[in-house]
């Protein structure tokens, strides 16, 4: 289809659970993308993980052909986007390839935080945003209130928002009709030199690197020689095509279209996301503005359970980095866990997802240590160093000043939940900067220590405000703080992977909570296991996992007390000997116990 006016590129912005993947399924069904027998719920959420958690993690693309009421057939290139705060970079990448976006709002729940943030991203990138009210078949749907909220909070006209129910299929054709009319056609010149933006890439064991691209200018076909602008390397195109949602090869990809290019690139970093592709004959083509590089906020150590898996683990991380450009890693070794990698993530959900993807897709068994942020230390020698791993902290006596990262957090919350949110921020050592009332919502700005934000702040903010509060934060500065290193000792030995950096005021509480938690998680042994929390040389908390004991008196029917004493003494001596040589196996849950401390 050479006519650009018949192409529509759009993505769907929606909060978690407002039904965007179901709506996508309906689009595919109505446009005949899949036969009825191939249709299954959430076609686009192809990762098992996405289905189980009911969230979209990776952006997916589908090309559909829709015959509109005006008799013309339109090519719809639809890019699915994630809704969770940790994956906002995926959203910005998807939006860069579109001219418009559908803002899908649950007619029962109304506008929620994440869609507000993503919607602003879309408006900043100059996209046409079209509101859609979903779940109209539910008894609690209240379209008028929700339209009012869209106008007040996001500031776009929602008077004639399309109402539909993706589950029952009601009104979905109306959404497609409106979409064709509202969203502008792409601009671009098919005869100009090729200019294509890489939205996403992933590694296929047989095909090499597969890149999902949005062609801005020109065309690309099989047999062309393409140049990757950032690496300067030239590759021969093996095939181009689109997902319908099945992998379908086409003759070429033209300006305005979204599809995949396979050019047997074997080097994992051969086609980085956000890069520009052009033909080798026109190397002077301008580089398209890519995406800003995302800085990791949270660092954690990942270690293979068996040291033989280290090489496989490194290969898996390399392949995953191609698909997820925000993941960073460097080698690390630990006394307790052996060799592994220190990885940087965007947030806690991102960390869990990466770990699960490594375990499932690459069949690895991993142990994760507690996450930490980057601290700045000024030593007494006058030197300044940064530390992202508590076990690498220098001796306290050599540190002149300990600084922690502070973030400026902007929280949008309905007025009735404001009190709970303020209480939470104070508990997390926050300092209020300002407060503004916007209609029924309040915007508060707080300076919060980053290590308080990354652990469980987002989850607790959601639960304390019934899911209505939204959070946006960015790094501001380093600030001096009274921080200490909390060590965990098991049977008198320090376990480096369990060390934590905490504020001195919270240290005693954290130490007690952590030892109690560890007591539940460490399996009982044949001898007593002492779990202690210490700051420097001072023990601040202790619990004991009691030994399992066999009833050695079971065989004594009555009999003399000295006989029983002898058996008990013998057992005691055996336990003592065992304790000297016994090793305690620490399960994976214990390393993550730190996260579950509801401070």
Swiss-Prot record:
One GO cellular-component annotation of the UniProt record comes to:
plasma membrane
Binding of GTP, residues: 17-22, 134-137
The UniProt keyword set, sorted, is: Cell inner membrane, Cell membrane, GTP-binding, Hydrolase, Membrane, Nucleotide-binding, Protein biosynthesis
Q: Which reaction does it catalyse?
A: GTP + H2O = GDP + phosphate + H(+)
Q: Any idea of its EC number? A: 3.6.5.n1
Ranges of residues in domain tr-type G: 5-187
Tell me the membrane topology, using the record's own terms.
Answer: Peripheral membrane protein
Subcellular localization(s) per the UniProt record: Cell inner membrane
Database matches in HAMAP family:
LepA
Which PANTHER family does this chain map to?
A: TRANSLATION FACTOR GUF1 HOMOLOG, CHLOROPLASTIC (PTHR43512:SF4), TRANSLATION FACTOR GUF1-RELATED (PTHR43512)
Family designation: Belongs to the TRAFAC class translation factor GTPase superfamily. Classic translation factor GTPase family. LepA subfamily.
* Protein name listed in UniProt: Elongation factor 4
The organism encoding this protein is Ectopseudomonas mendocina (strain ymp)
Q: Which gene encodes it?
A: lepA
């Amino acid at each position: 289809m050479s006519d650009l006016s018949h192409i529509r590129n759009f993505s769907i912005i929606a909060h978690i659970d407002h039904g965007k993947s179901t709506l996508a399924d309906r689009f595919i069904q109505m446009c005949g993308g899949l036969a009825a027998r191939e249709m299954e719920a959430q076609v686009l959420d192809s990762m098992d993980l996405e289905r189980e958690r009911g969230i979209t993690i990776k952006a997916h693309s589908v090309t559909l052909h829709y015959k509109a009421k005006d008799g013309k057939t339109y090519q719809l290139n639809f890019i699915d986007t994630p809704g969770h705060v940790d994956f906002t970079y995926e959203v910005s990448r998807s939006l860069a390839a579109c001219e418009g976006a559908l803002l899908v709002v649950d007619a029962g729940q109304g506008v929620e935080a994440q869609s507000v943030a993503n919607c602003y991203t879309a408006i900043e990138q100059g996209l046409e945003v079209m509101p859609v009210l979903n779940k109209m078949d539910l008894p609690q749907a209240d379209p008028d209130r929700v339209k009012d909220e869209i106008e007040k909070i996001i500031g776009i006209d929602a008077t004639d928002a399309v109402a539909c129910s993706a589950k029952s299929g009601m009104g979905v054709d109306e959404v497609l009709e409106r979409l064709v009319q509202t969203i502008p056609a792409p601009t671009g010149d098919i005869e100009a030199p090729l200019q294509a933006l890489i939205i996403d890439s992933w590694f296929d064991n047989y095909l090499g690197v597969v890149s999902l691209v949005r062609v801005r200018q020109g065309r690309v076909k099989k047999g062309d020689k393409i140049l990757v602008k950032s690496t300067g390397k030239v590759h021969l195109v093996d095939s181009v095509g689109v997902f319908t949602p099945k992998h379908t090869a086409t003759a070429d990809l033209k300006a305005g279209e979204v599809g995949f290019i396979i050019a047997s690139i074997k080097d994992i970093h051969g086609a980085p996301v956000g890069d520009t592709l052009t033909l080798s004959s026109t190397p002077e083509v301008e580089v398209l503005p890519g995406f800003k590089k995302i800085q990791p906020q949270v660092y954690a150590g990942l270690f293979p359970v068996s040291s033989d898996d280290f090489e496989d683990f490194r290969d898996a991380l390399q392949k995953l980095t191609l698909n997820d450009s925000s993941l960073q890693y460097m080698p690390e070794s630990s006394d307790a866990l052996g060799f592994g990698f220190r990885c940087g993530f965007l947030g806690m959900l991102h960390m869990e997802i990466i770990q699960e993807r490594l375990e499932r897709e690459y069949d690895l068994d991993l142990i994760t240590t507690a996450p930490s942020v980057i601290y700045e230390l000024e030593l007494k020698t006058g030197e300044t160093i940064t530390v992202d791993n508590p076990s690498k902290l220098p001796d306290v006596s050599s540190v002149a000043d300990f600084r922690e990262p502070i973030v400026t957090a902007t929280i949008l919350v309905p007025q009735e939940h404001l009190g709970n949110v303020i209480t939470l921020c104070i508990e997390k050592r926050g300092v209020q900067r300002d407060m503004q009332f916007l209609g029924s919502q309040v915007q508060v700005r707080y300076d919060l220590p980053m290590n308080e934000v990354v652990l469980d702040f987002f989850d607790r903010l959601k639960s304390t405000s019934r899911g209505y509060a939204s959070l946006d934060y960015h790094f501001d500065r380093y600030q001096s703080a009274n921080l200490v290193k909390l060590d965990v000792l098991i049977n008198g030995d320090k376990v480096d992977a369990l060390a934590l950096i905490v504020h001195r005021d919270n240290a005693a509480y954290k130490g007690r909570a952590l030892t109690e938690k560890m007591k539940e998680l460490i399996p009982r042994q044949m001898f007593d296991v002492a779990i202690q929390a210490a700051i420097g040389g001072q023990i601040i908390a202790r619990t004991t996992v009691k030994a399992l004991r066999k009833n050695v008196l079971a065989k004594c029917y009555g009999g003399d007390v000295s006989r029983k004493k002898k058996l008990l003494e013998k057992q005691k001596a055996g336990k003592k000997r065992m304790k000297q040589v016994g090793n305690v196996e620490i399960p994976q849950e214990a390393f993550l116990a730190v996260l579950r401390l509801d401070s």
